[in-house]
Amino acid sequence: MKHEDTILAAVAGFVDTLSFVALFGLFTAHVTGNFVLIGAGAAGFGQGILLKLSVFPAFVCGVVASSLIARAFSGRPAWQGTRALHAVQAVLLLGFCAAGVWASPVTQSDSLPVLLAGIVGTFAMGIQNAHPRVIARAGVPNTVMTGNVTQAILDVVDLLSAGTPDSVRTAARARFAKMWPAIVAFALGATAGALGFRYLGFWALLAPAVALAGLAACAGMSAGTVAREHA
């Protein structure tokens, strides 16, 4: 799907920011930030160290589940595995939404509803992190923007440098064209996630769940269109 990475980047930014502001600084879309927060918590800074520790196995389980789902569809067209992964992640985000509503108002980081919300949300984002690794496709990373921003800056330097060879400039232009929509989408998704939680609470998670359900539906529709064009 043409804009799949852009939509997924917005989903990641939305979910990661919502979980951060709602669940004591928890990052659900990646584990790097949680390692930092666990270290800070071990030294007596911050709170929610049990929550951060509990979501790491959930992230691992999400990656494993993604791999198992992809293996189950290994003998079929790639879009079927993609549709399954998007659908499973959408269901998990609905579970995150339900657990978050149950946990509200969030006051204790080690309460069962809060732990469950963090675990389900991180499980969902573990699936998204593993998705492009278990089903090969052309695209850009959509859950963590550090590498994308770094590459985009390097490409801009190449594009603006007078001595850049034409072949390097062409490659840089093509990469930048792929990178910047995901970067902008992640930033917009992050803003929307924070605002969504402020005004809607955990109900705001319905938005990324619907977006993923749409991607799941479009995976089959796009494949059907291509098949008809080649018929």
Functional labels for PLM-detected ranges:
Residues 1-231:
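Alpha-helical transmembrane segments of multi-pass membrane proteins
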